[in-house]
């Protein structure tokens, strides 16, 4: 560690052997020394290893069928959307592994374009949850943004770059890892322009936001304020490349079904046409038949639609699907509440009729799967308030009457132990 020469004691780095005169800084530990150059080298090695571990490797990338099977464990129904998402996500990360370029059979270089995803469907049908589950499976950073909070640069509201800040924060400010993450932009139907025809007045929260999103959707080197908010010239920025960020853009698109219905209904003209009633047209899955022209009529600009080539649609959940959502997935609501009651030493049971009644309530309210938890909270609130203070409850049974008629759940008392019986008889 230390060498004694003509000039007295000369300290050396325990790792590279350089003396304190050959390096800028020498840091002492218990019996060891390390120089600034070795510290820099260690940091570089750690960063490289972390970057390698955070990348989605092609040989480890799950196949589309495996992605769909994983989604099946958490999301009930929506099979068409699962297949579409599985293929799109697989191809996206395969493209990243190829470095945006691949070679065809003749050995020529082919540029692989990015395919962002547009998800259509009513609220409470699993759009957000599908995207969250995908990110969880792939172990990539995931951020959710609300399109309604965005405005064009220079106006009151959030800049589109703040979406990227959420992704960087989700990656613990590891920009390299964030550059292969997933961003989910919800309520995108709310930024549709107010009319199909371009307006002379500025639409800062509609068409203006769509225009602002174009660059980051396609892929650009964006400057992100580290603390969020508006940009100003005297602040530092985080630079992030969005070329390999997967964007999943979603919305309920209320009213789009009428546009599709009008277009589909026009086919029923002429002697050889299939004649369908208005009721028959209304009951079919309109979102599965959406064309770019329908989205343009709704209010999305053609350039925005062009950057969302993959379209996945989700459908309204029926009663059977909602009952399955309550009890079957790995983190089903019934399992969650069972665990909460179990922590108080109480068993919780839902009858089949009770689950069906909860599903009926969700359909009646029009909230889909998102409203199931609120109904469960209302039903269980009285017993969740009372039971922690009691030690004489063995079991709580929730029936259809509890859900429909506000009847308290049935409480099964705990059987006293033998010792307790003797004490009472004495």
Curated annotation (Swiss-Prot):
Alphabetized UniProt keyword annotations: ATP-binding, Chaperone, Metal-binding, Nucleotide-binding, Zinc
Gene3D superfamilies reported for this sequence: 1.10.8.60, ClpX chaperone, C4-type zinc finger domain (6.20.220.10), P-loop containing nucleotide triphosphate hydrolases (3.40.50.300)
Entry binding sites for ATP: 122-129
Chain ranges of the ClpX-type ZB domain: 1-54
Residues noted as binding Zn(2+) in the record, renumbered to the chain: 13, 16, 35, 38
GO MF annotations in UniProt: ATP binding; ATP hydrolysis activity; ATP-dependent protein folding chaperone; protein dimerization activity; unfolded protein binding; zinc ion binding
Family the entry assigns: Belongs to the ClpX chaperone family.
Protein name, entry field: ATP-dependent Clp protease ATP-binding subunit ClpX
Gene: clpX
């Amino acid at each position: 560690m230390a060498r004694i020469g003509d000039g007295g004691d000369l300290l050396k780095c325990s790792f590279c052997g350089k003396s304190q005169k050959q390096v800028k800084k020498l840091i002492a530990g218990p019996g060891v020394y390390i120089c600034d150059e070795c510290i820099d080298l260690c940091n570089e090695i750690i960063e490289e290893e972390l970057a390698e571990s955070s990348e989605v490797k092609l040989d480890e990338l799950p196949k589309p069928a495996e992605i769909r099977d994983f989604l099946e464990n958490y999301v009930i129904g929506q099979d068409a959307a699962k297949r579409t998402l599985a293929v799109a996500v697989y191809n996206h990360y395969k493209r990243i592994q190829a470095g945006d370029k691949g070679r065809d059979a003749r050995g020529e270089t082919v540029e692989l374009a990015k395919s962002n995803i547009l998800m259509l469907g009513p609220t409470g049908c699993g759009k957000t949850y599908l995207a969250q589950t995908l990110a969880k499976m792939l172990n990539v950073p995931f951020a959710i943004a609300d399109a309604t909070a965005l405005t064009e640069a220079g106006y009151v509201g959030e800049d589109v770059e703040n979406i990227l800040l959420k992704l960087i924060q989700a990656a613990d400010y590891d920009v390299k890892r964030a550059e292969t993450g997933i961003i989910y932009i919800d309520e995108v139907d709310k930024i549709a322009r107010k009319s199909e025809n371009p307006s002379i007045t500025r639409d800062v929260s509609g068409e203006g936001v769509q225009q602002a999103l174009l660059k980051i959707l396609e892929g650009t080197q964006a400057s992100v304020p580290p603390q969020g908010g508006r940009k100003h010239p005297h602040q530092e920025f985080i630079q992030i490349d969005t070329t390999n960020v997967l964007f999943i853009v979603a919305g309920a698109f209320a009213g789009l079904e009428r546009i599709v219905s009008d277009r589909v209904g026009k086919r029923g003209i002429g002697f050889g046409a299939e004649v369908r009633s208005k009721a028959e047209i209304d009951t079919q899955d309109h979102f599965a038949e959406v064309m770019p022209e329908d989205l343009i009529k709704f209010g999305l600009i053609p350039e925005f639609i062009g950057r969302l080539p993959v379209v996945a649609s989700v459908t309204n959940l029926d009663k059977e699907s909602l009952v399955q959502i309550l009890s079957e997935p790995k983190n089903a609501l019934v399992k969650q509440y069972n665990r909460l009651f179990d922590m108080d030493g109480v068993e919780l049971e839902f009858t089949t009729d009770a689950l069906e009644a909860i599903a009926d309530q969700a359909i009646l309210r029009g909230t889909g799967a998102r409203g199931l938890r609120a109904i469960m909270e209302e039903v269980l609130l009285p017993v969740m308030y009372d039971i922690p203070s009691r030690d004489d409850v063995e079991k709580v049974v929730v029936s259809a009457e509890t859900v429909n008629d506000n009847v308290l759940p049935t409480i099964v008392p705990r059987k006293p132990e033998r010792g307790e019986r003797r004490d009472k008889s004495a």
